[in-house]
Amino acid sequence: MRNDMNRRDLLKLAGMGVAVFVSGTALSAGEVRRRETESFYFVQLSDTHWGFNGPNINPDSQGTLKKAVAAVNALDKQPEFVVFTGDLTQTTDDRKVRRDRMAEFRDIVSQLKVRTVRFMPGEHDASLDRGEAYQEFFGDLHYTFDHKGIHFVVLDNVSDPTASVGEQQLHWLQADLKAIKNDSRIVVLTHRPLFDLAPDWDWATRDGAAVIDTLMQHRNVTVLYGHIHQEHHHMTGHIAHHAAKSTMWALPEPGSVPKKAQIPWNPAEPYKGLGFRNVEAEVARATYKIEEFPVGKAQ
């Protein structure tokens, strides 16, 4: 069986343009009855790169994040929370500019009409200063939270310049997961892929295999991540990994070109490849429905 699933395959499964992913095993009838009213959905945005300037790549670089915020606010039903999976800002060596960009980003996303907005860093936010500026604006680099029966784990695989989670954080993860049942629903939020998608393109986590080995001990695990600026779906054993699009620029499919490079802006198809997603957590059926939304006038 293939580990990778393309968009056409997913649409065949979903039928109506909403991809449905089964995560782990179904819950018991008693557990279903207990939680049947607790299904919910949230929004994932990623790789907003506030501060990027490149008219050949995105002539609307000052507008796409604002368009994404407006699109989320215009959804028929507001999500219970929004999560940004890293690269909130464009990297810079200037300490002041770095903080200015983070402040501007924070001001823009404060316009989201949701109760809770959660953040995590990307390498553009945290690798140059090991997350010092990021923590001033957004808090912890890694943490957990629980929502309606699902345990969310936010992992930092970017503040270490070697693209590692690190021994200390791995021990923290192992201790955290020991405190919950093996059949608990777990969603891991991270920036880089935990598996070796394309290591020569920096699409991997150096010690990701150790993280996956830890997660494999639990039956219901799903990973949502960013970094690769495109929708991508992969399985490691029973663990599903789903990458999100960027709101700033698209990147080519892994291995499709000799060298990774930003896809130039096409005036005939503005905003193509840019977007965000809704994730509906269906607790009773142990599934996640992922629906992709465009930014701007995407084709």
Can you say where each PLM-predicted feature lies in the sequence?
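N-terminal active-site segment of His-dependent metallophosphoesterases
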Residues: 13-14, 29-99, 175, 182, ...
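C-terminal/domain-terminus segments
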Residues: 290-299
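N-terminal secretory signal peptides and thylakoid transit peptides that target proteins
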Residues: 1-21
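Extended active-site neighborhood of metal-dependent phosphoesterases/phosphodiesterases
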Residues: 34, 93-185, 203-222, 228, ...
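Short active-site segment of divalent metal-dependent hydrolases/proteases
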Residues: 50, 90, 125, 194, ...
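Short acidic, glycine-rich surface-loop motifs adjacent to enzyme active sites
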Residues: 181-197
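Active-site glycine-centered loops adjacent to acidic/histidine catalytic or metal-binding residues
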Residues: 47, 86-87, 122-123, 191, ...
